């Protein structure tokens, strides 16, 4: 996958993507990140990319000309089709389902906003998608872009050591992930669950599914309303409820 990022602060992307999993993915040519400063496409003497809003109001808006020219230049250099994504608090909420959707593309173009927002013509005539990472406001879209890039990159085959790694992540199957343990089996008097030492994979799988359901039920019960639970899942939930609320 190729990801083009349009930003006013290209330096912000240097360190995070030169380390760990993303660096290995880039070294294998599984993911290619290209950063473009759209200030380079402003042609006035001050290289201005923002201006005051018509009708008055607080803040400055990103002008349409530099953004349109930047996207057009990027597409001229490489005509591979790509969604043009605005990162904005007004967009659809980013989640694991959206990450999977984006991971199916060969290429993404991501525009990082700044200041008060965009001239509406950018939203109407340039962007093909608009994404928000949550109901809060950031100074710019750069951190949001990093979140999207990281989440999407993990889903590209070969980026993680095993495809099972991304499939078992929280939210990948609609549930929070089960607890994990490693050596030592006893630490400061705290034991790991006996079933994990049993070698019985069927029991271990059942325990993991049950604990995933338990954690989701406790922390994010809303998630259970969005998935189809099997008869076995419902039986596990009944067991959990009986354990959590024992009768006298």
Swiss-Prot record:
Gene Ontology annotations for the cellular component aspect, listed alphabetically: cytosol
Sequence positions that bind S-adenosyl-L-methionine: 113, 133-138
Record's keyword annotation contains Methyltransferase: yes
Catalytic activity: guanosine(37) in tRNA + S-adenosyl-L-methionine = N(1)-methylguanosine(37) in tRNA + S-adenosyl-L-homocysteine + H(+)
Classification via InterPro entries: Alpha/beta_knot_MTases (IPR029028), tRNA_m1G_MeTrfase_C_sf (IPR023148), tRNA_m1G_MeTrfase_TrmD (IPR002649), tRNA_m1G_MTases_N (IPR029026), tRNA_MeTrfase_TRMD/TRM10 (IPR016009)
Annotated EC: 2.1.1.228
One Pfam family recorded for the sequence: tRNA_m1G_MT
Keyword terms of this UniProt record: Cytoplasm, Methyltransferase, S-adenosyl-L-methionine, Transferase, tRNA processing
GO BP of this protein: tRNA N1-guanine methylation
Subcellular compartments: Cytoplasm
Key word S-adenosyl-L-methionine present: yes
GO molecular function terms listed in the Swiss-Prot or TrEMBL record: tRNA (guanine(37)-N1)-methyltransferase activity
Top enzyme category: transferase
Primary location group: cytoplasm
Family indicated by similarity: Belongs to the RNA methyltransferase TrmD family.
Quaternary structure and partners: Homodimer.
Role played: Specifically methylates guanosine-37 in various tRNAs.
Protein name: tRNA (guanine-N(1)-)-methyltransferase
């Amino acid at each position: 996958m190729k990801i083009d990022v349009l930003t006013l602060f290209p330096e912000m992307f240097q360190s995070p993507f030169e380390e760990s999993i993303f660096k290995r993915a880039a070294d294998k040519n599984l993911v290619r990140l290209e950063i473009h400063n759209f200030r380079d496409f402003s042609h006035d003497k001050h290289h201005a990319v923002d201006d005051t809003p018509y009708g008055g109001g607080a803040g400055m808006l990103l002008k349409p000309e530099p953004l349109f020219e930047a996207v057009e230049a990027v597409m001229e250099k490489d005509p591979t089709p790509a969604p043009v994504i605005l990162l904005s608090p007004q967009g659809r909420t980013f989640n694991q389902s959206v990450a999977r959707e984006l991971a199916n593309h060969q290429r993404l173009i991501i525009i990082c906003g700044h200041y008060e927002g965009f001239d509406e013509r950018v939203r109407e005539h340039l962007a093909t998608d608009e994404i928000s990472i949550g109901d809060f406001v950031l100074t710019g879209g750069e951190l949001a872009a990093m979140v999207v890039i990281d989440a999407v990159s993990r889903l590209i085959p070969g980026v993680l050591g095993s495809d099972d790694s991304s499939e078992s992540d929280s939210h990948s199957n609609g549930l929070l992930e089960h607890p994990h343990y490693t050596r030592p089996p006893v630490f400061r008097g705290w034991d790991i669950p006996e079933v994990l030492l049993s070698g019985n994979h069927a029991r271990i799988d059942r325990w993991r599914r049950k604990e995933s359901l338990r954690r989701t039920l406790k922390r994010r019960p809303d998630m259970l309303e969005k998935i189809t639970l099997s008869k076995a899942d419902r039986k596990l939930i009944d067991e959990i409820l009986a354990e959590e609320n024992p009768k006298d």
